[in-house]
Amino acid sequence: LNKKNELFKNIFFYTETDFQKQQIKKNTAIDVEMFSNNLTFSKKEIPDKKFTIGILGESRFDKGFYKLPDLIRNLNSKAIDKVQFIVQINNSPKNLLGIKNEIYALSREFKNIEIIDGYISFFEYRKLLEKINIIPLLHELDQLKNCGSGIVFASMVNEIPIVIPKDALYVKKLFEFESFVEAKDLNDYSKNIIHIIENFSFFLELAKKQSLSYKNKLNFDPLNNRI
């Protein structure tokens, strides 16, 4: 029994979200600690020419993949001289094949869309984030009720302003500085992306402050110090 108790002293439990923390505490009476996502940091500057809009991750319905063609058309109709796109298409289900084909057709029409089809390594992911200036988080609101998204943390550590769904309250709580804008629909996404472009130095300064704040948080994270 003493050996068992000694072993448990050296086992630590962590969770990534407050919702998970509260559920574990409710069902087990264990008060676990929170662990912050640990990613690679990079610096951003104001681009010389076009602003790169980045959409990375899995191409699922609940992550808003179906919204992409309309967003691209909308933005290109208003600011084609100011924007270009990096779009990753990954794990797209069969019922969204039409959306995938539509994005390829748009890339042939507009010439300002770079498509990365399939899985990318972490190194490739980091390199793409270094190129991206603005991220639209197109997820369905239900997906963001009790947890964030790796893309949100990626925006923080890479000093990237982000447009998030309106009323994504959990995501908003992750930010100390308002390097994000909320959008209620696709027209709002386009309008706010253009708003960020036209005020980029302001949003970039906030993104840099947010990145530093998150870096400091990681430096004091107890799990980081144990690894």
Residue positions per predicted region:
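Glycosyltransferase donor-sugar binding loop
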Residues: 84-100, 118
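A short, active-site helix/loop in glycosyltransferases that binds the activated sugar's phosphate group
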Residues: 2-32
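A short alpha->beta transition loop at the rim of the catalytic pocket in nucleotide-sugar-dependent
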Residues: 133, 159-161, 166
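Conserved donor-binding/catalytic core segment of Leloir-type glycosyltransferases
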Residues: 45-73, 85-87
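A charged, aromatic-enriched C-terminal amphipathic alpha-helix characteristic of glycosyltransferases
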Residues: 184-194, 198-227
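Short beta-strand->alpha-helix junction loop in the catalytic core
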Residues: 18-20, 29-44, 91-92
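Nucleotide-activated donor-binding/catalytic signature segment of Leloir-type glycosyltransferases, i.e.
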Residues: 7, 98-126, 134
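Nucleotide-sugar-dependent
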Residues: 137-153, 165-167, 171-172
